[in-house]
């Protein structure tokens, strides 16, 4: 008789050698497209290590982003600009190992950090290869229409790409701070043009950060082949993402408007992830009257 794998507790946290959960379908781009067609919201959180990634996966989170936000929440930097490609590969590999050990099904996305793709398409390809070899299923890069040729170059060579518009933290100094983007008619038109260019270039996903809810809703309808993931962009996107530390209330400063502390009413970290998934799926988070502009 085959015995179930034994989970041995250690003083340093426990990740079982094989998942005790029922087998689930691995998340893939076709699976995400099916979810969108069915009207099911996509959930995403950031994670930077094996344990949190495994717990998020067990709670049913579909996508895990190894964000360059690790510079601020893990390394103590004031922005994401100081994060290196080596840093991103290290944390991506850690998350990938955590998911592998529990037979995780989440779709793993890794940020391409500042300075790793702007010089040339060839530089971007080399950087993307390192992240994919570390375990990523997709890479994410920030920037408007100027990144479209790079996106197309990567996609044509088999690298799935998630784009990022609105507030782009890597260029926060050029934007004048952490401000809502696309509020003016001119700003909205520019965002729309860039979003369409990125979809045409082959981007499969698009993070919209701190973009007015109505504009995000309109863009989502206009981008049938590019799944919009909102953070401070209202409830009309195809899915939502939050930074791990924000959604767990691990923050000593003022909470951003678009954040909700899911740990406040949860008995465990896994419970907080489950509450987040449930709230996004049933439409109670985000609440446009509280979490959007």
From Swiss-Prot:
UniProt-annotated binding residues for Mg(2+): 68, 111, 142
Domain of life (superkingdom): Bacteria
GO molecular function: 3-methyl-2-oxobutanoate hydroxymethyltransferase activity; magnesium ion binding
Cofactor(s) the protein needs: Mg(2+)
Residues reported to bind 3-methyl-2-oxobutanoate: 68-69, 111, 140
Catalytic activity: 3-methyl-2-oxobutanoate + (6R)-5,10-methylene-5,6,7,8-tetrahydrofolate + H2O = 2-dehydropantoate + (6S)-5,6,7,8-tetrahydrofolate
Sorted UniProt keywords: Cytoplasm, Magnesium, Metal-binding, Pantothenate biosynthesis, Transferase
Enzyme class of the recorded protein, top EC level: transferase
Full protein name: 3-methyl-2-oxobutanoate hydroxymethyltransferase
């Amino acid at each position: 008789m085959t015995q179930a794998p034994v989970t041995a507790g250690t003083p340093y946290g426990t990740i079982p050698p094989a998942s005790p959960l029922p087998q689930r379908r691995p998340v893939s781009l076709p699976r995400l497209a099916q979810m969108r067609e069915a009207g099911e919201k996509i959930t995403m959180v950031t994670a930077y290590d094996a344990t949190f990634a495994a717990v998020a996966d067990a709670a049913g989170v579909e996508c895990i982003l190894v964000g360059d936000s690790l510079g601020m929440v893990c390394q103590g930097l004031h922005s994401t600009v100081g994060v290196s490609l080596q840093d991103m590969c290290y944390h991506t590999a850690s998350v990938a190992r955590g998911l592998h050990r529990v037979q995780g099904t989440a779709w793993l996305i890794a940020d391409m950090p500042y300075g790793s793709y702007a010089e040339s398409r060839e530089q971007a390809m080399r950087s993307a290869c390192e992240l994919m070899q570390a375990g990523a299923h997709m890479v994410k890069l920030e920037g408007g229409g100027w990144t479209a040729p790079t996106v197309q170059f990567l996609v044509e060579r088999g690298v799935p790409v998630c784009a990022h518009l609105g507030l782009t933290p890597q260029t926060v100094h050029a934007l004048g701070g952490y401000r809502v983007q696309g509020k003016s008619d001119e700003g909205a038109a520019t965002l729309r043009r860039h979003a369409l260019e990125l979809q045409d270039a082959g981007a499969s996903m698009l993070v919209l950060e701190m973009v007015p809810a109505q504009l995000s809703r309109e863009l989502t309808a206009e981008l049938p082949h590019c799944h919009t993931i909102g953070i401070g962009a209202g409830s009309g996107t195809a899915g939502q993402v939050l930074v791990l530390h924000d959604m767990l209330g691990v923050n000593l400063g003022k909470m951003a408007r678009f954040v909700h502390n899911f740990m406040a009413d949860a008995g465990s970290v896994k419970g907080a992830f489950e509450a987040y998934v449930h709230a996004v799926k049933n439409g109670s988070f985000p609440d446009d009257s509280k979490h959007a502009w």
